[in-house]
Design a protein with these regions (language model features):
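Terminal targeting signals and extreme-terminal segments of soluble enzymes
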Residues: 1-147
Length: 147
C-alpha cells in the first residue's frame, strides 16, 4: 500500500478528501467531510450497527474516529510553511451523551496554530436534536524535514 499523494493538503474540496480517505480507517468507518476551511473542518457520520458497542450504544471509538479525522485534516490543511507533516501528541474526549441511530456531526476548530504545535477543539453533536455528545481536544506536533 502506498502513502497518499503529498499534495493533497492543498486541496480543500470535501469530495476530493472523502475520496482520499475511502481506503483508510476513516473511510471504512464512514467519515464524510462537509467543509474544509482555514482553521475549521466539519464532518459527519451516519450511524450503523457496526458503530455500536455490544450494549447497543455508540462505541466511544466511533466518536473519536470522527473527531480525530476532522482535527487531523484541519491540521494538515493548516500546516505552517516548510512543515512536512504532523503527529498527534495528546488527545482527550469527554463524553456527554450518546446515540443509537441517525447521524453525528462535528465541527473542528483550531485554537492554537503555532510553528511547532497546533491545538484543535471538536464538538460532536447528534444531527437529530443538535445535542452535544462529546468534547474532543487534540494537540499536534508539527514536523519539519531533517536538515
Amino acid at each position: 500500500m502506498s502513502a497518499p499523494d503529498q499534495d493533497w493538503e492543498k486541496v480543500r474540496d470535501p469530495a476530493a478528501n472523502n475520496a482520499l480517505i475511502k481506503a483508510y480507517l476513516p473511510g471504512h468507518v464512514g467519515v464524510e467531510f462537509t467543509s474544509i476551511e482555514d482553521g475549521r473542518v466539519t464532518g459527519r457520520l451516519q450511524i450503523q450497527q457496526h458503530h455500536l458497542a455490544p450494549n447497543g450504544f455508540m462505541h466511544a471509538a466511533t466518536v473519536v474516529t470522527l473527531a480525530d479525522t476532522c482535527a487531523g485534516f484541519g491540521c494538515r490543511h493548516n500546516l505552517p510553511a516548510g512543515a512536512s507533516g504532523f503527529t498527534t501528541i495528546d488527545l482527550t474526549c469527554s463524553y456527554l451523551g450518546t446515540s443509537t441511530e441517525g447521524a453525528i456531526a462535528c465541527v473542528a476548530e483550531m485554537v492554537h496554530g503555532g510553528r511547532t504545535t497546533q491545538v484543535w477543539d471538536v464538538k460532536v453533536r447528534r444531527e437529530g436534536d443538535d445535542k452535544v455528545i462529546a468534547l474532543f481536544r487534540c494537540t499536534q506536533m508539527v514536523l519539519y524535514p531533517r536538515a
